[in-house]
Every structure is written in C-alpha cells, then in structure tokens.
Amino acid sequence: MSIPAVAPAPSLPRRLLRGLRLFAATALLALGGTAAAENLSTVASGSLAPLPAGADQPQLLVVDGRDVVLSAGKAWALASDGKAWQPLTLAPAGATADVRMAVNAGGQTWLLRGTADGSDRLQGVRLQGDSLALGRTLALPVALGQAQVAALGDVLYVAGTGADGSMRLYRHALAAEAGGWQAQPAWPAPGPLVALQGQKNGLYAVIGDATGDALWRWTVDQGWRQAPEPEGHILPGSLRALGQAHLLMLVRDAGATRLRTFHTITSAWATLDAPATAAAPAPLAIVARGTGLAWAGADGGVHYAEVQGGKHLLGWLDWSVIVIYLVGMIGIGVYFYLKDQTASESEFFVGGRSIPFWAAGISLYATNTSSISFIAIPAKAFETNWQYLTNNLVAVLGLMFVAVWIVPLLRRLDLMSVFSYLETRFHPAIRMLASALAIAMQVGSRLSVILFLPALAIATITGIDVVWSILIMGVFTIIYTVMGGMRAVVWTDFVQVFVKMGGAIFAIGFIVWTLGADFDGIREAAMAEHKTKLLDFSFDLTKATVWGFIFLVVFDVVLTFPKDQVLMQRTLATKSDKEAGRSIWIFAAIMIPGGFIFYSIGTALWMYYKHNPGRLDPLLPIDATFPLFIAAELPPGVTGLIIAGIFAAAMSTLSSIINSVATLLSVDFYDKLAKNPTERGSVRFAEIMTVVVGLAGMGLALVLSRYDIHSLFDVSIELAGLLGGGFAGAYTLGMFTRRANSPGVAIGIAGSIALTLLAWSFDLVHPYFYLGISILLCIVIGYLASLCFPAPARSLKGLTIYRQDAT
C-alpha cells in the first residue's frame, strides 16, 4: 500500500513571512484611502500697535530681530511689549527717506535705496540702542527701475529694468573679498517684476501678468525654468522663504486674498487660512516676520499672520509597541549578562569567536544602515534623486575583493582591535595614533548624528523635547550594550534588521495604496521629474558622480576596509577566516535591495506630498519628512511599529559603535598603558568606557540639536572624511606594499589630515571626496616618505596580500 506524500510543514521563517504578508495586506485593505486632506499647519493672526503718527507711506522691516517702521526720513521700533512704536534716532538724520525695500543677508539688514532715476545702491543698517545706524554701501552697476532685492545665503541678488527697458539681474557675494556685482542671465519672460526671493539653492522671480502672475525658478544646474503658476496675483512684498523648502505669500484672485505656500521640492501649491485683515484693500507695506508675514493696512493698523506646526502625539497602542520593542532589547542584554557573568576578553569583545557567519553578515548590514539610512537617506531621495545609491552599487563590487583577500587575512591574525595590525606591521605609536583618530571619527561624525536623527523623529511625532528623546535613546542603548557585550550587540542587530526593514516596506506599500497607483505609476511620474536619476557620469568635482563614488569605494572599501573597527569586529567574531569572508558576502547581498528600499521611500514620499502638499509642515527640516509622514498619516499601532523601526535603525549602529570604541579604549590603551593589566580588569574598563562613550555621544547629539543643519547626511559624510581618512591609508601601505615603514606612515597620516583640512576650508570639492582625498594623500605621502627611511627589517609573514608573505 502506498502512502500519500505529505507536504512538509513550512519552516519558521516561511511562516513568519506568510504572517507578515497577511498582516500587511489586511492593514492596507483596512487603511487604504484614510489619509486626511486638510492642512497640517494652522495660521495664528493678530495685530500689532497701529502705525505711528506721520507714517503715511511706511516701509516695514525687521532689523536685528526688532520690528521697524520707516517713513519720510523717520524711523520707529516696536516696543518690547508690542503696544507702541518708539522713535529711533537716525544717523545721519533723514537718511532713510529714499528706501524702497529691505532684505536680510549676511547677518544684517540691507536697504535698497535710490533716486528719481531708480534704485542705485544697497546699504547695511543696524540697531544700536535707540539709534538706527547706516553702514556699508554697495553701489549697483546701473540704476534699476521696478527693482527687487533678495538673498540666497550670504549672496545678494538685485533685479530691475535698465535705462533701455531690458531686465537686469546682478549678484554680489558678501563673503567674497573681491568681485563686486556680477551680471546674471535674467528670466526669459516679459512683464513687470513683482517679487524676488531665494530659497533652497534657487532664486524665484514673480512676473506680473493681467491674467495671473508667473513664477520662475533659477538653479545652477537647470538655469531659469517656469514653475507652476500661483493662480492669482502675488501681492508685492509678500513673497518670503519659510523653513528649508517653502515659499510663503499672499495671493489675490477674484477679490479674495489667500495665504499660500509653494513647496520648492515637489513644485506644489497649498492654501492656508488667511486672516480677514488680509482681504482688505492692498496693504501699504508687507514684511517677513517670524514664521509668517506682517503688513500695514490703509486703516493704519499693523497685522500679522504666522504659520504654526502641530505635534502628533502617540496613542497607547503605539507606545505599547515601542515599549515591547525596548523591553525586548533589554531582555537580550540581560540574557547574555546572566549567561556570561565571568566573561573573558574574547567573550565580551568578539563573542568568543563563535558568531555564525550569517548572523555576523546581517549584523554588518544592521550596523551599516543606521538612522541615517532610515531618516536621512529617504529625505535625500525626497529632496533630490537616487545618485547617492550609486555608492551602494559600487561598494558591492569592492566588498567582493574584501571578502576574498582582506578580511580572511586579518581574521587569521586573531585580533580584537583591528589596529593591532598596525602595531605588528609598523609600530605601537602608529597603532595608538590611528586608534585615537578612529575613536574621534566614530564619536564625532557618527555616534552623535545617528543619535540625534531618531531624537528629531521622536520630537516631531510625540512633542517630547529633543533633549529627552536623546537621553531616552542613549540610556536604553547603553544598558543592553554594557550588559551583554558583543553577543548582545550582534543578536539585537539581527532582530532590529527585521523590525526596521518591515517598517520601511510597509511605509512604501501604504503610500502606493493611498495614492491609488501601483509601483509602475509612481516610477513613471518620478522619472518624469528625474527623481530616480541614478548615474551621473559628469566630471564635476562638486557633485556626487559615478567617478566620485568609484574613487571613494576604491579608497574607502577596497584599500582601507579594516579601518572600521565597528564592521571588522563582526568578522573577527566569526569561527574562521572562511566564515569571516562569508559574512562579507551576506553583507553585500543585502546591501543593494536594502538601498533600493530606503531610496524608494524618498521617491514615494515625493509622490505623496506632490498630491497632498498641505500635509507638509513648512516649519520642519527636510530630514523630518519621513518622521512627519509616520506621525501624521499612518494609523495607530502601525505608527508605533515604524517608530520602533527608527529606534532599531539607530540603536543597532549606536550599540555597535559604543561597543567597538570601548573595545579600542580597552585593548589599544588600557592594556598598553596600565601597569598590571588583567583580563578581568580590561573587561571592567571596557564596561565603564561603554557608559562613558555613550554619554559622550549623547552630549554631542545635544549640541547638534541646537543648530539648524540642512542635511545631516551631508554633515556625517563631511566629518567622516575630515576625521577618518588620515589613518586609513596606513592599512593600504601595510597590506599592499612591502616597502612602507613606520616613520613614513606617520608622516603620511599627518600630511593627509593637514591637506584635507586645507581643501575643506576652501570648499574645493564635494564633501563625498574628502575621505578619498585624505586616504590618497596618506598613501602617496606615506609611501614617498618611507623611501627616505630604511625598509622594514621585521618579517612580513601573514601581513600583506602577497603570496610570498602568506602564512
């Protein structure tokens, strides 16, 4: 009798994946089309003190943070209580009678002044007590009629009509010591100039027309291009920049006046609720004030409207999901603490060299995809395109070389600190110098940024102050890292990869479902705006090009992969050199699909906010776009799940950095400098340093929270290049040459750091090049300097990639 075949029971991973698919499909079916259409931002309006007597033709401006009225050669400043205008003394008297408008640039206010022939100069002005003092004058090349002035960073732009009636545009860089005014191409459209404004690396000009104004945008890459029309007439003087990517203005059509925003990334318009005072006859004067506008009415009143963002508090279900995740991470730390209470150095630093290669590979990816991947990369793709993804594609090719040649070589040496190699190959001083620079780079350029980004997300979503968010994140990470050592770090990484990738995939699916389109529709719309542009083969060194990424990967991955203790420590924790190489293959296999997921989030967000511009908060930084979407658009429970993903993205890298830096401090410094170091003392010192390093990262993150930084992704790249490239070239000199020696390497490290700082101070190239340049300089200078000293006398067996030195 034959026995019918019975299908084997699905494996646990398959059951989990099947459950996740069922959950996602059910959630999307239940939640599709639930996104609200109303604006997230509100408008607060009110009135200031009425215009002072005698201010019949007023000019409103803000000087050094105070509201000022100019009229007929007189000036007044608003009192601190906002109830009256106080007269100001002019120096010289009556000097402001010919002011046409004002703009703030370079840390001060500039007045556009002129005569009956037109505007002919800009002049700085400051408040000094109760006096309004005039300063530096910038004479225009020619007098301009209908002139408008704008600022883009510390660059002034002035536009208007020349004597022949043609439109003129001039720029002046305030920071430049020479150069003066430079003529620029004006927009190719007829009509009077209504307004001029700078925002997000672009200049915007409003051109008047009887049927409705036109908006033109200028950027370095594309020149002048017409943007979508505002559907009405923009009131002169009302155009202003708001936040990092919005324009705010008063638009009038069919007798109604609306407060409107234009998002410079999606080129989409949104309408806010304008106060009734804005619907009165045309204001006498308008000025950018706070987060909105202020205007003087014909009735003598001074009114204002300010844009306000909101906080999106988490519900009990969201907090429950987050708490379960955090408790789970602490639980893993407690488990390994109880299991290995008498941990040796090998157990605490490299997990007893018993970590499976597949777990090490997943941990490598988790560590490499921090909160920068989860928050800043979607923001970068949302703002620009996919060009930075080229780095992932090229890096995979570099990792193939690393898996075959570099990692097995170092794993055979049974290191705990990868900088021990530099001592064996060169000198103990080289090891300690390189280790110190690596510690500074990890704490300064990575730990602080990676901790700050999720804190920003939490603050955006919950309303909890960024300071408290940083403290909570840092403390939880420190606890499970100090308790469980390397084993806890690797296995929490393993869990965190699935948490954050699941949240990322769900977010993309939710956006596609909500828009009522499939991935092909989103891809086609995004490609029409070049949002998925991936490859740039130009030779412009100020841009992120293919050649730049190849240059970076050759020096950052192929030649100097061992410089990163955080990544190398996982390969050193595997059972053998073969398993160490396999962990790199796993890492490379995950990197490309993972990169596409995070860049797809940015493109999906662009499509969502292109169709729903009112759901953006103009006051939030671009880096907060994905956290805002999570908070405002996703339903309870799912929001908590993806917030847990943000936590996972940050904590996996934070714990890895903290553990690795503590390892370096213990192995490279404590064991070398202590009088009678013991194995138990080394582990105890590492535990203490885990806490100290975590607290230091928290402190630097608190400092970052006090600054308005446009893109933390770029900041992280820049700092890593300045701090991390100098010592990295030492590995290239050690593994790929047999002639390099310790004096030459020391000179190479010092010279590369000095020259890279020089390139940074003059802003010569794109920040992505700093790391590669620093490494290249270290290699070239170090090798040439080595030729001036005797060749190494010690054996190089097992220390280079060459066959004659193989073990």
Feature map (PLM): residue ranges:
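Repeated scaffold domains used in trafficking and secretory/extracellular systems
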Residues: 54-60, 95-103, 142-150, 190-198, ...
